[in-house]
């Protein structure tokens, strides 16, 4: 059976993506082996999932070593410079942009490592990865 890996920011720990996810899960569960990976820092699950849906709760704070490695990685990454200084950069001071891009990159790297370590990249030819938002979860899949 094909797998669907759904990456959420809040659901089912808080309301978050509930209006988008709930109507779709009933149908997708009939055709896919569904897993939800929630990145919410909340501890208590507020909303039930349909039977058969596996839930994984991801929340990780970076260690000092990971932050330092990310800083050096940024210095060697052309996309980092384009995001901070390029024509399409976000508004605000360059320091604020730099911190946002650096943290986004670190979060994506740590989440990608989690996905790899937990086996979510096994059987990729039979897996669909889905994120509602363009955030570090989506970037981890890039």
Question: Can you say where each PLM-predicted feature lies in the sequence?
Answer:
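N-terminal subdomain of nucleotide-sugar transferases
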Residues: 1-64, 124
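Extended hydrophobic/aromatic segments used for targeting, binding, or gating
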Residues: 6, 136-142
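Serine-centered coil/turn micro-motif
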Residues: 15, 77-78, 135
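Amphipathic alpha-helical segments that form well-ordered structural scaffolds
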Residues: 27, 110-116, 140
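Short, flexible coil/linker elements and helix-boundary hinge sites characteristic
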Residues: 33, 85-86, 117-119
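A conserved catalytic-core segment of Leloir-type glycosyltransferases
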Residues: 43-106
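Short N-terminal targeting/anchoring amphipathic segment
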Residues: 95-106, 113-136
């Amino acid at each position: 059976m094909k797998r669907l890996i759904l990456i959420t920011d809040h659901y089912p720990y808080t309301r978050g993506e509930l209006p988008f996810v709930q109507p779709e899960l009933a149908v997708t569960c009939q055709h896919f082996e569904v897993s939800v990976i929630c990145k919410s820092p909340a501890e208590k699950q507020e909303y039930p999932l349909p039977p058969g849906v596996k839930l994984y709760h991801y929340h990780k704070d970076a260690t000092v070593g990971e932050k330092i490695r990310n800083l050096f990685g940024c210095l060697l990454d052309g996309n980092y410079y384009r995001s901070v200084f390029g024509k399409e950069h976000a508004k605000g001071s360059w320091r604020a942009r730099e911190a946002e891009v650096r943290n986004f990159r670190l979060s994506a790297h740590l989440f990608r490592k989690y996905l790899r370590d937990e086996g979510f990249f096994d059987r990729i030819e039979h897996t669909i990865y889905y994120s509602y938002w363009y955030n570090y979860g989506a970037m981890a899949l890039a």
